[in-house]
Amino acid sequence: MKEILHEDLVVVRSVCNIFCLRLNMPIIERYSAIKNGGIVFTGNTLGLSKAANVASPGVLGSIGAFISLDTSLQVSTFPAGTTLDYTKNGSAAVLNLPAGSTVLYAELVWGGLFRSSANNISALLDNPVEFITPSGSNSIAPDVSTKQNFNITEEGVTLGFYVRTANVTTLVKNAMNGTYSTGKVPALIEAIDARTSETNHA
């Protein structure tokens, strides 16, 4: 997900994920300016909903497969372009800024489930992710000053989620409009619903 400024008057003070208020997470100022401009968000999911206790398509509040940009990969009866391997996940979105726009600041934000009742991949959370712009592929390390890990308890199961961010202003300024994708995002997938209390995202 990128945050980009263009046209109309705005004041940008912080970047925060939706869990900040619930979990009393700190709001960290990433960019501050008073400019004629606007804010644009673009992004996509990395996970597809699953059926009960299997890695198959369904409508539970948990993911059963990652999206992959490699359409030769496929998980069970999920569509082509799916994987269980986080190093092969990836998702794309199109950025379309108005003509004449100038990018003042752009931030990449990613996250997912890192702890279930059976597994914990916290050692992988600071690994670089792959960020592909219209100009090419880039390895992006998370900014240590904004990293967030947090635990919640649902139905007696303690789950761990994380958020990482990185300043990608130069990359977006150079590439501007087109298709952007992010991949190799560490996250857990659990086929057994009790391990996540049907609560999972990436």
Language-model regions: role of each:
Residues C16-A202:
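Disulfide-rich extracellular domains of secreted proteins
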Residues M1-L23:
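Cationic, amphipathic, low-complexity alpha-helical segments enriched
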